[in-house]
């Protein structure tokens, strides 16, 4: 089989918005100052991902010379997030629970004020992508998703793009995560003959930040197709170029 082409784009839920920026900026700044300190874990500063890059990846796509990108953008614009979530919640409601509500005489009242966001995310903890924490190259925070609604929503989005032939089908479950540390961005380290990623002993970091809350109850505002390779911004931050996005409403 020919090798799979390198990914050029990804579908994601961006995590940085007007509501989350202050929370994430404070959390990431404190984390950065701690783990990069020579008196603490002495992690190379380049390994800590910039604020503007934080997102939840749904899937990656390959569009050499941008071939197929137009189709992906068109598909994105046909999505109706509210309808997708309504279908998920309808499937979650069992006949037994629906019957119990009717017996109690529960009725749905019209909410006062602005409607609640369709999806909100709390980002918590720190985990190693590698099975051995003492030789980690990627550390990530997980969204709190007790009912599994966020995961099912993202799985529906991924399936839509896979069925259209725009995203490769992977034989592994979707792991929603926000990358906090990735040592691939550390320059000038000897990576050996095979150009392997440098690794860190993350055991102490994982112990310290296992219950750390990065942001809490932040509304998800967009679904986006972004281009691989974060770009430097005028304010010194980094961010991925957005090819197309839709509102989560």
Residue positions per predicted region:
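Histidine-dependent nucleotide/RNA phosphoesterase domain, centered on the 2H-phosphoesterase fold
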Residues: 1-249
């Amino acid at each position: 089989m020919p090798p799979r082409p390198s990914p050029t784009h990804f579908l994601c839920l961006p995590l940085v918005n007007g509501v989350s920026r202050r929370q994430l900026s404070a959390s990431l700044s404190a984390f950065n100052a701690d783990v990069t300190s020579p008196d603490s874990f002495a992690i190379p500063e380049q390994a800590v991902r910039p604020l503007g890059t934080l997102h939840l990846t749904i899937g990656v796509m390959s569009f050499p010379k941008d071939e197929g990108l137009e189709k992906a953008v068109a598909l994105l614009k046909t999505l109706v997030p509210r309808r997708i979530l309504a279908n998920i919640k309808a499937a979650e409601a069992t006949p037994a629970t629906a019957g119990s509500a009717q017996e109690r005489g529960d009725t749905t009242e019209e909410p006062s004020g602005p409607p609640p966001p369709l999806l909100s995310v709390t980002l918590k903890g720190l985990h190693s992508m590698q099975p051995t924490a003492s030789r980690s190259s990627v550390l990530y925070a997980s969204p709190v998703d007790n009912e599994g609604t966020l995961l099912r929503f993202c799985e529906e989005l991924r399936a839509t793009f896979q069925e259209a032939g725009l995203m490769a089908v992977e034989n592994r479950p979707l792991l929603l995560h926000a990358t906090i540390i990735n040592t691939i961005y550390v320059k000038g380290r000897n990576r050996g003959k095979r150009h392997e990623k440098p690794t860190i002993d993350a055991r102490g970091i994982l112990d310290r930040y296992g219950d750390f809350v990065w942001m809490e109850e932040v509304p998800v505002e967009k679904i986006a197709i972004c281009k691989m390779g974060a770009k430097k911004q005028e304010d010194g931050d980094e961010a991925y170029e957005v090819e197309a996005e839709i509102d989560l409403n």
